[in-house]
Amino acid sequence: MIIDSHEHVILPAESQLEKLKRASVDKAILFYTTPHPEKAKSYGEWKEEMAKLFRILAGENTEKSNSERIHRGNQELLRSIRAFPEHFTGFGGVPLGLSLTETGSWIEEEILRNGLRGIGEYTPGSEEQIRQLETVFQAL
């Protein structure tokens, strides 16, 4: 069995599955994502999708908007996994900046209850975000 150990969700899931088949990959470990450059129909739309990533890395989002964004990303991830469980498994997102109790609850509700295999990925864009990883590690 050939497993791709790191892919981000591509929409629609059927498109991602087709890419796996063309590459003779049996299964992929998926990670949630916010930008979806594959949906862009023009260079301008592609730039808009990538701007989302740059705002995240710059820490320009509120704690509430980050939690909402990651929850939506986890839901997309779960839809892909549930549509093709023989081909996809996944790691879910956990927001930074929550308290230890909130982080533990998030992991229980969003990750464990949904059968996800782990958490990730993190791309901290500031020293503050790097320090906030400690809470996630403690909650595990």
Annotate the PLM regions.
Residues 1-72:
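An N-terminally biased module of ancient metal coordination in phosphate/nucleic-acid-related enzymes
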Residues 53-140:
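Active-site gating/metal-coordination segments in enzymes
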